[in-house]
Regions:
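Conserved glycine-rich Rossmann-like NAD(P)H-binding loop of the short-chain dehydrogenase/reductase
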Residues: 35-50
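Short, small/polar-rich loop/turn modules that mediate ligand/substrate recognition or access, typified
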Residues: 89, 183, 188, 245-247
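Alpha-helical segment proximal to the catalytic Tyr-Lys
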Residues: 134, 180-184, 243
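Residue(s) in the substrate-gating loop at a strand-loop-helix junction
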Residues: 150
Length: 258
């Protein structure tokens, strides 16, 4: 009865920020669960992106890489169209692309730096969710949108990551608004809020001795998480196991925000 609960067989997933870290881990897990995929990242990492495509294919699934800047409307349109041209549908969207925090207090933060963070972390997720949701409605049968947020969007920090915190807090509200709007179409929208995960994206948090010590004091499990430890929740939200879950912001943080 429950053996196929986490199966993604016959599904097509679109994953941004898929070249490394959490995005790559989710892509490989989705492949093992049965999903064909389009993985995307910005143009500066095509070799890493192609490697992920080969890893997906090695697991017996179809895959396509599409470099794109999700903050650019024309790139988003191209990404969605290439996915549809290749696979004919989109069942799952994972908005994982993100801009690194700009380390600055709010009063010293430059306007262009603030806009850069919001362009990718918020605007990008908005543009892609909007475009993909429209296709899901046309397709019928529902769909899943998973936004990769952060515990930084759940509480204010005074460590120079203010713009990042703001972008993720806004993403959380967007998640819940879209969950309500899209519920009549059985499109489920949720967010995952990782804590301190050991990725290149957050390298400064686990390589700088002072920041590392500060983070470890906050984490009840007293260690950084690994990208693979986010995968289980992503599978739940993408599969039949999460069919009655929508509008949630779910933390994966080792007890950081208890």
């Amino acid at each position: 009865m429950f053996e196929n609960l986490f199966s993604l067989k016959g599904k097509v997933a679109l994953i941004t920020g898929g070249s490394r870290g959490i995005g790559r881990a989710i892509a490989l897990a989705f492949a093992e669960a049965g999903a064909d995929q389009v993985v995307s990242s910005r143009n500066k990492r095509p070799p890493e992106l192609e490697k992920v495509v080969e890893e997906i294919k090695a697991r017996g699934k179809k895959a396509l890489s599409v470099p794109a800047h999700v903050g650019k409307k024309e790139d988003v349109q191209g990404l969605v169209q290439k996915t549809l041209q290749t696979f004919g549908r989109i069942d799952i969207l994972v908005n994982n692309a993100g801009a690194n925090p700009v380390l600055s207090s709010m009063i010293d933060l430059e306007e262009d730096s603030f806009e850069k963070v919001l362009e990718v972390n918020l605007k990008g997720a908005f543009l892609l969710s909007k475009a993909v949701a429209r296709e899901m409605i046309k397709q019928g049968g529902g769909g899943r949108i998973i936004n990769m947020s952060s515990v930084s969007g759940l509480r204010a920090r005074a460590d120079g990551t203010g713009a990042y915190c703001i972008s993720k807090a806004a993403m959380n509200m967007m998640t819940q608004v879209m969950a309500r709007e899209l519920a009549p179409h059985n499109i489920l929208v949720n967010a995952i809020a990782p804590g301190s995960i050991k990725t290149e994206f957050s390298r400064v948090n686990w390589t700088d001795p002072e920041r590392k010590a500060s983070r470890l004091r906050e984490i009840e499990l007293k260690r950084f998480g690994e990208p693979e430890e986010v995968v289980g929740l992503a599978l739940l939200l993408a599969s039949g196991a999460g069919s009655f879950v929508t509008g949630e912001i779910i933390r994966v943080d080792g007890g950081m925000t208890i």
